[in-house]
């Protein structure tokens, strides 16, 4: 349980109405300790500034921009890859950043700064060369474009749009463009020429051709606004638009129809009532299912005929359409119809739109995995919800007032997340708790210290263990005496590094000292310094030609290196997958969407990071919003690596899949020097891996996309292995299981 004793005391002693207010009364040391673990309000008092600068500078965004010193800001954001949370601070200190920052820092900050014409002139003077200014300007934001008079070249426009497609809108509004360029951009990128440069090229045929390319209602409306009215009255244009409306593109043409089609209501058919009040008696029409689907979004224009529409829907069993207009048909909904809507409609309906909140309806919503089950609390007590298997605590619940209405819901939240700084921060500092709800929350947490509320299941889950202050043991690397009496052949290799402090060089030297590695492709390493360059000579290891054996031994090396505090980051395979971040934020995670490479490649020293630097390295590699701990980063590395070697290894394996999986797990444990035996069957994992293997074998792609939850069993296995790794590294905790 997160300790809130000091916060509770401050809350009571100072008669605070919010927990945020109470946080401001904490002793600085206590406040900083909580800030370090990510448990803090959305803003901090000035009195904590110096301590935050010293101990957790990445949290400077919690102060108002004017409170943050420019040099402190620049020093901090220079080290971070993801600076989204510093957006207002970056813009506030724009001048200091432009004057002080180098090219890479300015590029990093460009999306957040409101750039003026004077700023562009300054950047041109600072960074001479067309390519430099074009590259820097490619990161500009739309707010800057709306405020400047600078005219972008066609090359600059293409560069900007290649980086962010939707930047076409402010650019096209900003300046008149050549018609040939506009046509090229339409053909190449599908960008509608909403620019006065195209006006002289327009004719009815061209207007229709452009409308055929439109995919956003806003673009259609804005394009028609610049067209000459005489051309908009052409019959060919009118006929095309009427047909487009009948195809369901209603939002695209609402202003146009009201101005130009008042005399064509008969041609509009059932859709006429959307634009003109009760223009058509729809009871005289033969209404199709497609038409009902199209008009369901606009049911407020058909209230006169709602009974007629409902009769058609029920006669034809169009449950999906009934669900889409549920707010207009409350009087006809029985319990049976509510259940049918819940079970048969493609898209979930809001529970608040279901007029009957019976236990049976609730059970159906649970089975269909509705996220707003909490709304049944207006009729059903929380114990019944839990008994039926409901989880009323979801992302949706934060959008409601239920936490202030039900103290039992807060207690349930604490049982689920009381160990998680991120999730408790959301409820305590970001949700508008009343004074009474805040008091109940603090009292419950303070009176249930330790892990008492999390026994017996939660304490052995990976999300719980990741939020606890555990560590992974790093065995000391044995000293290896350097041997300089090595005879190198002409075909032996040389690597060069810029300094002895280069992280890849330091990893290489440490790796060379670790005994028992099987596949690391460098042996007999020596190095010398020459002209400020570190030259490393080595003899390549002999290749292992049996692919399956190579993969297994390579995983052993990765695990063995981890046991000595050198962790492998598999970003070449998984470029954006960080399951640990989801877990410490209390969110569900699924398998990665894509594996970038289907071949297990050789290992290189620069891919291994020392444990004490791992949190920063992983956070920057994946451009996270905050820095995770070394411990959390290590588990992310282990889990990602194990997943990759299971999936890609099984694709290459010629063994029976079950034998391969068990062998991989044994090798992984052996490399980590963990004495564990998997007691659970892996048949479900094998089924998933075999499906991936079949798919990969049938194609010739160098990568593979994964469907959501396609590897759920495999991920569960990886989680269990990580849990065992943590428990083995923290034996005192393991003994209390």
Swiss-Prot record:
N-acetylated on initiator methionine by host. Induction: Expressed in the early phase of the viral replicative cycle. Keywords: Acetylation, Disulfide bond, Early protein. The keyword Disulfide bond applies. It comes from the Viruses. Disulfide bonds join 496-535. Transmembrane segments: none annotated. The modification N-acetylmethionine is found at residue 1. Belongs to the orthopoxvirus OPG064 family. Interacts with host KLC2; this interaction promotes IEV trafficking by engaging the host kinesin-1 complex. Interacts with protein OPG056. Plays a role in intracellular enveloped virus (IEV) transport to the cell surface on microtubules. Together with protein OPG056, forms a complex that interacts with host KLC2 (kinesin light chain isoform 2) to engage the kinesin-1 complex and thereby promote IEV trafficking. This is Protein OPG064. The gene is OPG064.
């Amino acid at each position: 349980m997160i300790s809130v004793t000091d916060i509770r005391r401050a809350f009571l002693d100072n008669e605070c109405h919010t927990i945020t207010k109470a946080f401001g009364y904490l002793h600085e040391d206590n406040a900083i300790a909580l800030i370090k673990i990510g448990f803090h309000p959305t803003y901090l008092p000035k009195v904590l500034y110096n301590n935050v600068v010293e101990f957790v500078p990445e949290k400077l965004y919690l102060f108002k921009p004017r409170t943050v010193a420019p040099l402190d800001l620049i020093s901090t954001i220079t080290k971070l890859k993801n600076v989204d949370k510093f957006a207002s601070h970056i813009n506030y200190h724009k001048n200091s950043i432009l004057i002080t920052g180098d090219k890479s820092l300015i590029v990093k900050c460009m999306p957040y700064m409101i750039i003026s014409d004077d700023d562009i002139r300054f950047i041109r003077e600072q960074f001479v060369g067309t390519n430099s200014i074009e590259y820097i300007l490619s990161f500009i934001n739309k707010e800057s474009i709306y405020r400047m008079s600078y005219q972008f070249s066609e090359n600059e426009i293409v560069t900007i749009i290649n980086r962010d497609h939707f930047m076409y809108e402010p650019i096209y509004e900003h300046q008149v463009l050549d018609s040939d360029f506009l046509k090229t951009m339409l053909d190449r990128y599908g960008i509608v020429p909403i620019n006065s440069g195209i006006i002289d090229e327009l004719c009815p045929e061209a207007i229709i051709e452009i409308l055929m390319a439109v995919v956003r209602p806003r673009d259609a409306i804005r394009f028609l606004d610049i067209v000459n009215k005489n051309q908009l009255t052409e019959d060919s244009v009118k006929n095309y638009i009427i047909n487009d409306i009948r195809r369901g593109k209603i939002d695209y043409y609402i202003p146009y129809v009201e101005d130009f089609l008042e005399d064509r209501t008969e041609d509009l058919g059932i859709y006429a009532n959307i634009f003109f009040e009760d223009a058509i008696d729809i009871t005289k029409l033969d209404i199709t299912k497609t038409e009902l689907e199209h008009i369901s979004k606009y049911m407020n224009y058909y209230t006169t005929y709602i009974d007629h529409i409902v009769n058609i829907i029920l006669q034809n069993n169009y449950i999906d359409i009934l669900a889409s207009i549920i707010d207009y048909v409350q009087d006809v909904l029985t319990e049976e119809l509510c259940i049918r809507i819940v079970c048969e409609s493609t898209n979930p309906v809001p529970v608040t739109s279901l007029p009957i909140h019976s236990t049976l309806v609730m059970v159906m919503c649970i089975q269909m995995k509705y996220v707003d089950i909490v709304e049944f609390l207006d009729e059903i007590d929380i114990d019944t919800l839990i008994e039926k298997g409901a989880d009323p605590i979801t992302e949706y619940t934060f959008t409601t007032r239920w936490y202030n209405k039900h103290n039992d819901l807060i207690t349930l939240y604490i049982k689920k997340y009381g160990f998680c700084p991120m999730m408790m921060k959301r409820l305590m500092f970001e949700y508008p708790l009343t004074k009474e709800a805040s008091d109940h929350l603090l009292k419950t947490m303070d009176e249930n210290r330790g892990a008492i509320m999390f026994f017996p299941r939660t304490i052995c889950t990976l999300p719980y263990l990741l939020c606890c202050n555990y560590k992974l043991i790093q065995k000391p690397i044995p000293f290896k005496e350097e041997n300089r009496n090595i005879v190198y052949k002409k075909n032996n290799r040389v690597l060069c590094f810029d300094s002895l402090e280069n992280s890849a060089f330091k990893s290489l030297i440490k790796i060379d000292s670790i005994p028992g590695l099987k596949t690391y492709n460098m042996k007999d390493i020596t190095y010398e310094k020459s002209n400020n360059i570190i030259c490393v000579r080595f003899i390549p290891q002999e290749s292992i030609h049996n692919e399956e054996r190579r993969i297994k031994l390579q995983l052993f090396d990765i695990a063995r290196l981890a046991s000595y505090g050198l962790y492998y980051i598999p970003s070449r395979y998984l470029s954006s997958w960080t399951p640990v971040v989801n877990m410490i934020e209390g969110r569900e995670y699924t398998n990665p969407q894509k594996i970038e490479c289907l071949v297990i490649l050789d290992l290189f020293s620069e891919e291994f990071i020392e444990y004490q630097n791992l949190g920063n390295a992983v956070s920057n590699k994946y451009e996270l919003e905050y820095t995770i701990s070394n411990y959390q980063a290590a588990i992310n590395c282990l889990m990602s690596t194990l997943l990759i070697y299971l999936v890609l290894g099984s694709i290459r394996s010629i063994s029976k899949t079950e034998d391969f999986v068990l062998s991989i797990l044994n090798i992984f444990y052996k490399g980590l020097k963990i004495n564990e035996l998997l007691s659970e069957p892996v048949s479900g994992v094998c089924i998933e891996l075999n499906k991936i293997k079949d798919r990969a074998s049938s194609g010739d792609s160098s990568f593979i996309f994964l469907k959501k939850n396609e590897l759920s069993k495999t991920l569960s296995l990886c989680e269990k292995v990580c849990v065992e790794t943590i428990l083995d590294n923290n034996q005192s905790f393991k003994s209390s299981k």
